[in-house]
Amino acid sequence: VDSEKIAWVLTNLLSNAIHYTPENGRIIIGARQQDHSVEIYVQDFGKGIDPRYHQSIFDRYFRVPGTKVQGSGLGLAISKDFVEAHGGTLSVDSAVGKGSTFVIKFNV
């Protein structure tokens, strides 16, 4: 495992959570073991992502329409590539107005 790449992914997910969470908002970072896998998650309580964009946000250069936060649209695509190169998955669970949870999952 390339720990630097996984650290980069976590830093990117945390940075996104900070940018999309209102001032004094809450962000949760955690890990849990599920049967034969380990999950690391970053959860925010920001504006959330419309479900129709849940797959597209992992595409290079994609930006959710109306997003005001600066960015290149590369962070999540690169994060997904790094995680998948290590045999894992990166997914999102999000609803508009309720925030987002990004989950990195590795089989153990």
Enumerate the predicted regions with their spans.
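Short beta-strand/loop element within the Bergerat-fold HATPase_c
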Residues: 24-36
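Short alpha-helical Gxxx[C/S/T] motif in the catalytic ATP-binding
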Residues: 75, 79
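Short helix N-cap motif at coil->helix boundaries in the Bergerat
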Residues: 48-56
